[in-house]
Amino acid sequence: MRKILKALSLPICAMLLLSACASSLNLRPGPFRSEMQDVFVQQTTLAVPASHAEHGEDYVIEWQDPVMEQHVRKWLDRPKGDIYHSDVWDYQRVTINSGTGVGDLIVKDAPDGVDIGGNVSSNEQLAACAVSVEGTYDPVTSLADLRHFDSLQVLYINNKMGASPITDLTGLEECKNLMLLSVPSVESSAFPTFAKLDSVVELKYGSDGIRADSNVSDLSALAQMKSLKMLWITGSEVDLTQLAGADLRVLRLDVTRIGSLEALKQMGNLSLLQLNNGQEIDSFAPLAESSVQYLSMSLSQGAQETYKDMDYTPLTQMPQLIWLNLTNNITFDTETCKKLLANDTALKYLNISYTPAAKDAEELDTAHLKEFTAPAP
């Protein structure tokens, strides 16, 4: 049944305002989220079934990076002595936090099939295999030593704000089961390694929420990743033509400037696009010729004037569009919204919270929508 949500009280309005930012969170579907939010989360969440790799001979690890060695010694509670290949070859998920004030998270020996990419606290089987380890470390700059982690499927690297970029990704080439990779800024000289990561399905690149800290000067190596379907980039100015050959299903951009969206027309399988908290964009026109079905253009209050001079007409010309969030787009008007609803029979989920069109919500024909959210400014 169609749901119509309006500003009935201050608490509800506050919750809806927070929903403008919720799409930037990696949250699983749950009982406290709307159907529209659940749909978005389902489209942007990668399941990583646990598996175990075959191991070769055992040997003493000769460490290349002392910071990585410090992390592993802390995990093993082994401040001195040799560390063997067999000590690390069953690690399936690793979160390394350096200088962030948060402990590392390690998952090993998870039963085959358990989703190790999910939220540990909400999965008993996963939680039983997870360990959090506190420690104080310098930022990680090399991932070369991860070549010894045969079973690694999920890897998150988080360095403190302002840390130097990672200089070496070569160890990841040997992680043949790696599916989900999240890394902060990487030096340009290390980017070619991305093209060799054939098993990675989801890549989160850049310091989370800190655009200026991420090197995005040349992303062409990402377009050569054979299995890559889901890409989230945080950075400054991004040239999408460098990604034109990528076979992406999901593209999420938290960047300062994109410029042209023309490259989207060459991504025939791209179904979800998130423009997170506003970017400088030349025109929305290429969206009309894209394959995008799920489009998030929600803005925070601080960024609500980002698209004030843009023409939203191309959004009314997207025949495959199913899901659209325009929260805080302060120049999306009633006339354009009426065109959108009249022309797009595929559209099922629409959020126009805090837009001019929301003031005239009663005039809009939303009968075909599954969910319509429109608290007025």
Model-predicted segments: where are they?
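Sec-dependent N-terminal signal peptides
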Residues: 7-16
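Bacterial signal peptide processing site
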Residues: 22-25
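C-terminal motif of bacterial Sec signal peptides marking the signal peptidase cleavage site
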Residues: 18-20
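Positively charged n-region of N-terminal signal peptides that target proteins for export
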Residues: 1-7
